[in-house]
């Protein structure tokens, strides 16, 4: 992995044990697995309002960030981390849940709107741009009916995955980690295509 391509991985979620393993915290879950695989531990960083962890060395060092600001203020932590560690927007990847995608699907984008996601909206506002990479992880919607979906959105995203869903999610997390570990400065499009077309039974 080349240093000019990836320096900071941000997982979005809400802090606190009451939110652990909820659908909205799937970004946290990916980072926790990356940390476990690389034997690194998260530590509190008050100056950037988040928990950080780093792995690798030299030009291959990558930092992980889980904001402690709650989802709607995630951008505050991301901007502080970017400025403190002197990263550029193109060295950042945000991992986020997406209710518009079914469980088992991944969507990678190099830029774009928030899609109604408050965490992404906050990051866009604090960075002053929507031009940063984001990796959206499908969590499915509570209903196909728009009115019912709207009324159940909060309970759905703050709910936990079933045992069956966790099996699918684990495949997704491992595929994401495999791709992140192989990112270089000239294969982002290839990685994006691989993730966008991934199916858990591949």
Curated annotation (Swiss-Prot):
The entry's keywords: Cytoplasm, Hydrolase, RNA-binding, tRNA-binding
Site (Discriminates between blocked and unblocked aminoacyl-tRNA): 14
Binding site for tRNA: 19, 70, 72, 118
Keyword Ligase: no
Reactions catalysed according to its record: an N-acyl-L-alpha-aminoacyl-tRNA + H2O = an N-acyl-L-amino acid + a tRNA + H(+)
MF-aspect GO terms: peptidyl-tRNA hydrolase activity; tRNA binding
GO biological process, one term: protein quality control for misfolded or incompletely synthesized proteins
Record-linked CDD domains: PTH (cd00462)
Subcellular location: Cytoplasm
EC number of this enzyme: 3.1.1.29
Positions of the catalytic residues: 24
Protein name as annotated: Peptidyl-tRNA hydrolase
């Amino acid at each position: 992995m080349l240093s000019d391509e990836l320096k900071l991985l941000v997982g979005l979620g809400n802090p606190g044990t009451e939110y652990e393993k909820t659908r909205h915290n799937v970004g946290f879950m990916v980072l926790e697995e990356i940390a476990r695989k690389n034997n690194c531990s998260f530590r509190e960083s008050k100056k950037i309002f988040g928990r950080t962890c780093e792995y690798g060395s030299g030009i291959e060092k990558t930092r992980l960030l889980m904001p402690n600001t709650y989802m709607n203020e995630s951008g505050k932590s991301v901007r502080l981390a970017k400025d403190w560690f002197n990263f550029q927007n193109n060295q950042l990847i945000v991992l986020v849940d997406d209710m518009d995608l079914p469980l088992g699907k991944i969507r990678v984008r190099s830029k774009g709107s928030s899609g109604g996601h408050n965490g992404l909206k906050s990051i866009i506002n604090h960075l002053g741009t929507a031009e940063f990479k984001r990796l959206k992880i499908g969590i499915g919607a509570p209903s196909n009916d728009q009115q019912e979906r709207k009324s159940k959105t909060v309970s759905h995203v703050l709910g936990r995955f079933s045992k069956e869903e966790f099996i699918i999610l684990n495949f997704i997390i491992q595929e994401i980690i495999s791709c992140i570990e192989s990112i270089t400065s000239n294969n982002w499009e290839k990685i994006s295509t691989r993730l966008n077309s991934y199916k858990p039974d591949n």
